Regions:
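Short, flexible micro-motifs
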Residues: 29, 40, 80, 84
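N-terminal positively charged helical leader segments and presequences
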Residues: 32-58, 64
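A short, structure-level motif marking secondary-structure boundaries and short turns
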Residues: 15-16, 40-43, 91
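Amphipathic coiled-coil/heptad-repeat helices and related helical stalk/stem segments
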Residues: 26-27, 52, 72
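Fold-independent oxyanion-binding glycine-rich loops
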Residues: 27, 46, 92-93
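Ribosome large-subunit tunnel/peptidyl-transferase-proximal elements
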Residues: 2-38
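Short basic, glycine-rich beta-strand/loop surfaces that mediate nucleic-acid
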Residues: 58-93
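A short linear-motif detector with a strong N-terminal bias
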Residues: 2-3, 21-23, 45-47, 66-71
Length: 93
């Protein structure tokens, strides 16, 4: 199975998608979800530190999980139901 990475041109539809799923937030929790097979899709913030996003992106390739990019950390955090920014999140349902 091939991994599909993309930067979306329809940011709002991706953020709506995030908000409709149960998610884990943060690099450490996301890595655990990938390793356990619970992650269904990963979301990364464009303005997040590449030191955080690049290893997660590599893990997505390793585990054959789609990876979508969202406009910024604050929007990703809000879509996940938290009031602070998030560099990474994963849909787990």
């Amino acid at each position: 199975m091939e991994t599909h990475k993309f930067r979306t041109t329809d940011d709002q539809s991706i953020l709506n998608e995030v908000s409709q799923h149960k998610t884990v937030v943060g690099a450490k929790q996301l890595r655990k979800a990938l390793q356990s097979g619970r992650a269904k899709r990963v979301y990364l913030a464009v303005n997040a530190d590449p030191a955080i996003t690049e290893p997660i992106e590599a893990m997505c390739e390793q585990y054959h999980i789609d990876c979508a990019w969202v406009p910024n950390m604050l929007d990703l955090g809000k879509a996940c139901g938290i009031e602070v920014g998030a560099a990474a999140a994963a849909a787990i349902d």
